[in-house]
Amino acid sequence: MEKTVIYLLEDGYVDFVVEKIRTKMEKLLEEKDKIFVVLAGGRTPLPVYEKLAEQKFPWNRIHFFLSDERYVPLDSDQSNFRNINEVLFSRAKIPSGNVHYVDTSLPIEKACEKYEREIRSATDQFDLAILGMGPDGHVASIFDLETGNKDNLVTFTDPSGDPKVPRVTLTFRALNTSLYVLFLIRGKEKINRLTEILKDTPLPAYFVRGKEKTVWFVGK
């Protein structure tokens, strides 16, 4: 049964979040041969990923997927893949076959199709989704409900957000296969959006929930 937990953190945000993620991943790995984890882009989770890279996980048993990607070259400093790779994938020496990302060298429709095929061939659900939320309440690159409600697992957007570029994103349908959803948010604007979500305001992040549990890690 889905439930929601909120942690309000004054200090030690990164260490607290990493410990919670480590504990959850270790428990999942005790129960399953392989686990499937969604990672958000953006700035907030990067220090968390950097600390996760120091953990002694059996990385060959963990498959990672990006929640969304900016439609820019993979070596661009705006690329979610590049930024996560620098702090996690390369540091932890995660096998390349366990890292699933959007091939932005393809036309955007083809990139979506390829990423969706890759997801479907790997799993029918995610075990853990580590997500963020924008100050406007967007999640992944779902800035409006029409995008989130697409029937596919993967879709694309017109130029949106900051930087204002086209994006590829998992949809609500994909994200809501996750057993556990962890939202990492910091700052007053995002806290205000969470307050609205708790009052059932239909912002995009409102519609993403873990099948077992949804956890919000809220920092200053």
UniProtKB/Swiss-Prot annotation:
InterPro entries recorded: 6-phosphogluconolactonase_DevB (IPR005900), Glc/Gal-6P_isomerase (IPR006148), NagB/RpiA_transferase-like (IPR037171), PGLS (IPR039104)
Its EC number(s): 3.1.1.31
Pathway the protein acts in: Carbohydrate degradation; pentose phosphate pathway; D-ribulose 5-phosphate from D-glucose 6-phosphate (oxidative stage): step 2/3
Keyword vocabulary terms for this entry: Hydrolase
Entry keyword annotation includes Transferase: no
GO process annotations (BP): carbohydrate metabolic process; pentose-phosphate shunt
Catalytic activity as recorded in UniProt: 6-phospho-D-glucono-1,5-lactone + H2O = 6-phospho-D-gluconate + H(+)
Regions annotated as coiled coil: none
GO MF assignments: 6-phosphogluconolactonase activity
Enzyme class: hydrolase
Function: Hydrolysis of 6-phosphogluconolactone to 6-phosphogluconate.
Family in the record: Belongs to the glucosamine/galactosamine-6-phosphate isomerase family. 6-phosphogluconolactonase subfamily.
Record-given protein name: 6-phosphogluconolactonase
